[in-house]
């Protein structure tokens, strides 16, 4: 089978790329007729399915009309920029998937820009044309304008397009004429995506991602640029810094369907997995044993944000989790560094605190959520933006942010963003909604989403991506309200919560276990207030009729992990355990906090 096509799929969160890949797999009969696989086959960890985002890239391979098509699913989110660049290195063309109603979004621009720079051929799929009020032609023009802006060359601007609805299982050259299957899409891939360029010469393969199997250890994945790899062959590894390490390939796998199949040899142009390589890293080149030649390594986006990870030392530590010591946390973070390229870790002067650097709150919260599900307990400090000194000037990361919201509430939102040093770049009306673009420091984005959703009754859609470092923009107002802090350990009693409701909003339900120093609510004023919600009603034998009204308690506010991280202040931690998220003061007792203040 000589023909191989390697394509990467680019799409904004929730424009349907994972659904599209599902349909391609069904069309190419990867599954037996009676097999029930569930939807979203590619998003294979629970976190991805719940959030509807792809975090790590996947490889799937199908055969269509004697052509082997390797489909590489890319993460759509700029926080996972490290993943994106590696993945595009394996592809020869990209399939750009856009929603017929929303058009190309900022995150799409980020990945597409990388693909255009690498000189890949784009093909466009306008999906969800069955939506009401959609405008496929305008979206097609918007994609053209976007590519032109990014600096695509003429041959890239001459891109083929198909329209369709992946969920309904059809694609067509004309969106007004639905077909019965997705063949037009596959035909477009076979016809327009170039086959891999294969040079003559010795073996060369850039390791672009890795997998881990407890049975065989780490597995290197990449596309073989030239030459032929055979099982048992001796090779050289050219490291990122130019060092050369000798190694040997024990087993070779190629991708087939969703899985891998063991083969004896792999020809140039195909994507393969090597088992048994010792000591490789992502970005190394697998080269010839005698005269190794390295390939250009991948530049990875630098981290822009840091958080402090520390052991859980609250009064409730060890109740939920299996792994609670600093050794466990350090081992887990070190393991994550191997495959999570945009992540960095630094040890601090304390043995149980680690600084972890990443691309944004989402990037780090996905790691924390994964650890939490694996049974770890830990505490996280407030996210801090990384400030760099460039030519003697202090600079901070700046992002491009797009907010899509109803026109009625746009004034409030614009005011909120400008207070946080955001500058509006453009504003356009789409029906009854407005799409506003801002340039805003990353510091300003932390905690903005919560306030925006409150101000717009949950209607605002916010996306942002990192652009560059710019000189510091000055002070940004922090959270206005103080915290309600528990002064006793015990159970929250409805009677006490009821009496304190006019003091602020609570984060705990009646009956929940709490401890001294836990942040159990938000004060309606600006300072912190210690309250006791463990007090019960004193029972005396004097009763007047009607005085014992039932406590009417407003439901507690429950945070998601990102919301909690964005909410806390400098002197607070988020306590993360497999079953609970709690906010707490770093210093638990009121006396300690007062003493610390006076210093």
Segments (PLM) and residue ranges:
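Acidic, low-complexity intrinsically disordered tails
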Residues: 582, 588-599
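Canonical P-loop GTPase G-domain recognition
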Residues: 121, 131-191
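Residue-level signature of catalytic and energy-coupling elements of molecular machines
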Residues: 14, 20, 52, 71-73, ...
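A short, contiguous, amphipathic alpha-helix enriched in charged residues
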Residues: 314-337, 550, 554-556
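Conserved structured catalytic cores and adjacent interaction surfaces
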Residues: 2-19, 78, 91, 101-113, ...
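Conserved nucleotide-binding/hydrolysis modules and their immediate coupling elements
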Residues: 204-307, 315-319, 481, 490-540, ...
């Amino acid at each position: 089978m000589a023909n191989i096509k390697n394509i990467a799929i680019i799409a904004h969160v929730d424009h349907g790329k994972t659904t599209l890949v599902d349909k391609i797999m069904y069309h190419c009969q990867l599954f037996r007729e009676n097999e029930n696989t569930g939807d979203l086959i590619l998003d294979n960890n629970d976190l991805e399915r719940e959030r509807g985002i792809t975090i790590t890239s996947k490889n799937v391979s199908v055969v269509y009309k004697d052509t082997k098509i390797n489909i590489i699913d890319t993460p759509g989110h700029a926080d996972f920029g490290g993943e994106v660049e590696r993945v595009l290195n394996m592809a020869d063309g990209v399939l750009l998937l856009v929603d017929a109603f929303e058009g190309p979004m900022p995150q799409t621009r980020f990945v597409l820009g990388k693909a255009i720079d690498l000189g890949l051929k784009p093909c466009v799929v306008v999906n969800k044309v069955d939506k009401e009020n959609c405008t496929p032609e305008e979206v097609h023009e918007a994609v053209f304008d976007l590519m032109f802006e990014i600096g695509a060359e003429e041959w890239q601007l001459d891109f083929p397009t198909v329209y369709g609805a992946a969920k309904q299982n059809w694609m067509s050259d004309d969106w007004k004429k639905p077909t019965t299957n997705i063949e037009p899409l596959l035909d477009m891939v076979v016809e327009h995506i170039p086959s891999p360029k294969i040079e003559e010469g010795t073996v060369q393969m850039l390791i672009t991602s890795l997998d881990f199997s407890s049975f065989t250890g780490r597995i290197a994945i990449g596309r073989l640029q030239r030459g032929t790899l055979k099982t048992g062959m001796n090779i050289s590894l050219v490291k990122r810094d130019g060092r050369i390490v000798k190694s040997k390939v024990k087993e070779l796998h190629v991708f087939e369907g969703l899985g891998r199949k063991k083969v004896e040899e792999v020809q140039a142009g195909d994507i393969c997995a090597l088992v048994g390589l010792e000591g490789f890293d992502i970005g190394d080149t697998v080269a010839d044993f005698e005269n190794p030649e390295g390939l250009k390594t991948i530049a990875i986006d630098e981290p822009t944000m840091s958080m402090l990870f520390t052991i859980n030392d609250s009064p409730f530590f060890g109740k939920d989790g299996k792994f609670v010591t600093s050794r466990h946390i350090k081992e887990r973070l070190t393991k994550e560094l191997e495959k999570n390229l945009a992540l960095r870790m630094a040890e601090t002067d304390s043995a149980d605190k680690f600084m972890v650097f990443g691309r944004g709150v989402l990037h780090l919260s996905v790691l924390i959520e994964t650890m939490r599900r694996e049974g770890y307990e830990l505490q996280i400090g407030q996210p801090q933006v990384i400030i760099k000194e460039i030519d003697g000037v202090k600079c901070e990361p700046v992002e491009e942010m797009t907010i899509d919201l109803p026109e009625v509430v746009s004034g409030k939102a614009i005011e909120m963003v400008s207070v946080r040093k955001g500058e509006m770049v453009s504003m356009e009306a789409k029906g009854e909604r407005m799409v506003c673009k801002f340039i805003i420091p990353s510091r300003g984005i932390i905690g903005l989403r919560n306030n925006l959703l409150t101000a717009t009754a949950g209607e605002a859609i916010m996306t942002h991506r990192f652009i560059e470092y710019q000189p510091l923009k000055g002070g940004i107002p922090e959270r206005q309200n103080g915290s309600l802090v528990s002064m006793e350990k015990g159970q929250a009693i409805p009677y006490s919560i009821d009496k304190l409701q006019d003091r602020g909003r609570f984060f705990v339900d009646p009956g929940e276990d709490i401890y001294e120093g836990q942040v159990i609510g938000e004060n309606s004023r600006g300072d912190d207030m210690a309250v006791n919600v463990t007090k019960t009603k004193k029972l005396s034998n004097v009763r007047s009729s009607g005085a014992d009204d039932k406590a009417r308690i407003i439901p507690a506010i429950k945070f998601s992990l990102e919301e909690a991280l964005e909410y806390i202040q400098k002197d607070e931690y988020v306590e993360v355990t497999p079953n609970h998220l709690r906010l707490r003061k770093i210093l638990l007792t009121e006396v300690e906090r007062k003493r610390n203040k006076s210093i």
